[in-house]
Amino acid sequence: MTWSRRQFLTGVGVLAAVSGTAGRVVAKTLNINGVRYGMVHDESLCIGCTACMDACRKVNKVPEGVSRLTIIRSEPQGEFPDVKYRFFRKSCQHCDRAPCVDVCPTGASFRDAASGIVDVNPDLCVGCQYCIAACPYRVRFIHPVTKTADKCDFCRKTHLQAGKLPACVEACPTKALTFGNLDDPNSEISQLLCQKPTYRYKLALGTKPKLYRVPFKYGEVSQ
């Protein structure tokens, strides 16, 4: 059973943009029912076209020189002429136990209780880079214009607020990305996690990442 547009819009609720209020306070103004968003990247379907990267940059107005999302191509796997490449998504994992949140001295880095999305309040960020140093996935950066920490937010303040799926999900031509509510057993993402083997990167660190991956069938899975 797939997640209908009505269910998705209900889950999105009133995802409001952060505007001069502490992240922990803003979280209380969002959908009171609460959801826990996650994503699956199917490495067996990803062709490395980088359409997701282009869509992310355009929708979220990410300047050149930095990126919220990167697709990394592996070394060739297999023997000629049967050569394959594995494509690995590098982006925020939206951890339930996010080190970046724990080290932030101003509360600018926060996990939204209503959606499970880890985000940054630019009005509180002082650019100290503690969160960048603490993130074991190396997916945060200082925005060259705002001089504050930035990263993937699942398009929380753009597409999600408008009732759409994240830009990367909408742009993927092979449907390698699935997004939805992990706490809804009937959602498309929950059904997928029941049907396919998945792994999570650096799971042993105890961060409880919410970016799942269907492994590429050649070679070993990176942990």
Role assignments for model-derived ranges:
Residues 1-16:
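N-terminal secretory signal peptides and thylakoid transit peptides that target proteins
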Residues 20-55, 204-214, 218-223:
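C-terminal segment of N-terminal export signals and the immediately downstream linker at the start
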Residues 24-29, 51-73, 97-124, 130-147, ...:
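Iron-sulfur cluster-binding cysteine motifs and their immediate structural context
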Residues 34, 87, 145-150, 206:
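Short, solvent-exposed loop/turn segments at the edges of secondary structure
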Residues 37-39, 43-45, 83-86, 93-95, ...:
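Short, flexible, mixed-charge glycine/proline-rich loop motifs
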Residues 70-101:
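Mid-chain, structured segments of secreted extracytoplasmic proteins
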Residues 153:
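Cys/His-clustered metal-coordination modules, chiefly Zn-binding fingers
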Residues 167-223:
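Long, compositionally biased charged/polar accessory segments in the mid-to-C-terminal portions
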